[in-house]
UniProtKB/Swiss-Prot annotation:
It comes from the Bacteria. Belongs to the peptidase T1B family. HslV subfamily. It comes from Paraburkholderia phymatum (strain DSM 17167 / CIP 108236 / LMG 21445 / STM815) (Burkholderia phymatum). Allosterically activated by HslU binding. It catalyses: ATP-dependent cleavage of peptide bonds with broad specificity. This is ATP-dependent protease subunit HslV. GO terms for biological process: proteolysis involved in protein catabolic process. One of its GO terms (molecular function) is metal ion binding.
Length: 178
């Protein structure tokens, strides 16, 4: 059976502001199944942003588990991410899930990979998904050479990724914490 896949999620942190955005395309094989999916959300009393890429059902399963870990650890993003990663590595069912998450709060941005790794991105910029490399390169160039806000950088990076990646569209959802 073919998998749902393809998306672009990008996060930019600059000073005390962070933005996290994603496109809206859901693809099954070579068919666009949905163009307006919401892959970026606010959770934990709107204090944490999360974006997901990969298999849609897998991503929702991980999102639910991550939200439970945040509740258990009173919103401590790093602790919740590490605990989710531990479960992801040891639980036989979770190990089969094919998804990645970017999470951000007022002070921290983390990438949680399908291997159960928790990564703190260099320079406050990270991206995942099929268009992630395009978006990350664009975000880095914009951050290094302009005074744009994190939201503006995320928006422009997603636009560039949407122009280059066939699994990424121009329907964007962007959330910020300031």
């Amino acid at each position: 059976m073919e998998q749902f896949h393809g998306t672009t999620i990008v996060s930019v942190r600059r000073g005390d502001k962070v933005a996290l955005g994603g496109d809206g395309q859901v693809t099954l094989g070579n068919i666009v199944m949905k163009g307006g999916a919401k892959k970026v959300r606010r959770i934990y009393n709107n204090k944490v942003l999360v974006g997901f890429a990969g298999g849609t059902a897998d991503a929702f399963s991980l999102l639910d588990r991550f939200e439970a870990k945040l509740e258990k650890h009173q919103g401590n993003l790093t602790r919740a991410a590490v605990e989710l990663a531990k479960d992801w590595r040891t639980d036989r069912m979770l190990r089969r899930l094919e998804a990645m998450l970017i999470t951000a709060d007022a002070t921290t941005t983390l990438v949680i990979t399908g291997n159960g790794d928790v990564l703190d991105p260099e320079g406050g910029i990270c991206a995942i998904g099929s268009g992630g490399a395009y978006a990350q390169a664009a975000a880095k160039a914009l951050a290094d050479n302009t005074d744009l806000s994190p939201r503006e950088i995320v928006e422009k990076s997603l636009e560039i990724a949407g122009d280059m990646c066939i699994y990424t569209n121009h329907n964007r959802v962007i959330e910020t914490i300031e």
